[in-house]
Amino acid sequence: FQSAVSAACKEKDIKSGIITGFTTGGVAALTTLEFEPGLVHHDVREAMQGIAPYRDEKGHVIHYRHHDTWHDDNGSSHIHSLILSPFITDPFVDGKITIGPWQNLTLVECDTRDRVRDIVFQVMGE
């Protein structure tokens, strides 16, 4: 995602402005974070499970009313993406995205199974 945004800024010769991105899936999110294995593969997941757990202590899928409507098991996934947000806006200056040295624009998959995701983004500026 981040490399595509940077390439679009260069291709359109836009030096300064903002990018806004949106993931069209209902159970994914866009954010900035340090893409470090412990954070990405453990800490974020544990934090989200503390807020809206997928399984109980016995390993059973926790029932959410969403499951009654769609007959699936990803009610907690919708809550996770709601908290993290499916969109992001970030400024760029001199053709570079303005994020910290350890930050990355990141798609966070919140669903209970793998999916292919589309990200729509716009670059606005001069």
Language model features: what each stretch is:
Residues F1-E126:
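Active-site histidine-anchored catalytic micro-motif
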